[in-house]
Amino acid sequence: MQINKPDNTLQNISVGSKEINAARVAFFLPGFVISTWAPMIPMVKARLKLEADVLGRLLLCIGISAFIFMPLAGALVQRFGCKKVVITGATLMALISVLLSCLQNIWSYAIALAFFVAVMGATDVSMNTNAVIVEKLAGRRLLSGMHAFWSIGCFASAGLFSVLASSGSNVTLIATLHCAIVLALLAVFGRHLLDYKIPGGEKAFAIPRGIVIVLGILACISFLVEGAVMDWSGVLLTEVKNMDIALAGTGYAIFSVAMLIMRLLGDKTVQFLGEQKAVIGGSIVTAAGFALVVVLDNLYLNAFAFILIGLGCANIVPVFYSLLKYQKGMPISAAVTSVTSLGYTGVILGPALLGFVAHGINISAVFELVALLLVIEAGIAKYVFCKLKM
């Protein structure tokens, strides 16, 4: 069944099950490729003989390159459309991941990695633009489930990488097989991505303003939350809670699984609760999880706290993207570009900010600060929904 939306800019686009599945695959592929590259980092560190601080600075600079390039993604969508940008971006990411597996020089590796992350930024913007439009035209909630497919891609890639590596396959062969999977999925689903372009006369890039900049700031806080669990949960469990080093990764693993499950259930959950309750309630639940992690010392109670964090924050970012379809101040792709760019400041600057807090005060203060930011996020979100009159 095809569902048509009578909109002046979208009247020639129809959405059915093929377009919805293609949008899900558009999220799966970048997650799949990123989790192909991530396990290579220790191998690359050893092969290029990099010290930890050099590797850290390299990764920070690469992250900044994505942030700089991301605002140009709207222009790419305007000129070429969502379909071409997603297909080209996912293809280049897969091919570059193979290149990253075999480069022997730090400078060539840095250039290739910078290009990889820049392409990832453009793909991120275009896939979210495609998803927002698909949800708008379909007339039902879809974004939480689509974001779940990013996580599914990460899990699938990491699992396949581990199986192949344990069987003795070298990293270049593994990356090549992963690349082939990406290209095969693009061949099947890529043609059903939306060929949406920004209408003539509308700017592809605009300085974020009004409700869009507020949503971008909220997205920044939400990305910072995910980064805090990823970067600092292991340190908290081992150094503050005095747990065995073997348990260092349990917090992030529990958080990731809880987030994935809730995102798979997220569209129906948000539809039942409403967007406002899902965001504000999710922020409060997540803040409670961070507070409990600080005060509880039992392994199982800490696991419960990380479950709360994963469940609470799972649907916040998808709802922020979904809200962009209600605003009238900017074209959808420009609004998505703005929110994504501002959100990624939490990924890029968050680890450094939290590191200063951990060094200047203590590690527990990192989680206390994030809990406070989440309470502030809930208050600002209330203002956003009032402005949108929802």
Question: Where are the regions that the model predicts?
Answer:
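C-terminal transmembrane helical hairpin of 12-TM major facilitator-type secondary transporters
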Residues: 276-320
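Primarily marks hydrophobic transmembrane alpha-helices of the MFS/SLC 12-helix fold
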Residues: 83-86, 279
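C-terminal ends and interior cores of transmembrane alpha-helices
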Residues: 91-104, 285-297
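Helix-breaking motifs and short loop linkers at transmembrane-helix boundaries and internal kinks
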Residues: 49, 81, 102-107, 242, ...
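Intracellular juxtamembrane helix-capping segments at the cytosolic ends
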Residues: 121-136, 315-328
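Helix-to-loop junctions at the C-terminal end of transmembrane segments
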Residues: 69-81, 165, 262-274, 358-359
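Symmetry-related core transmembrane helices of the 12-TM Major Facilitator Superfamily/SLC fold
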Residues: 172-190, 367-383
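Short amphipathic helix-loop junctions that connect adjacent transmembrane helices
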Residues: 39-53, 231-247
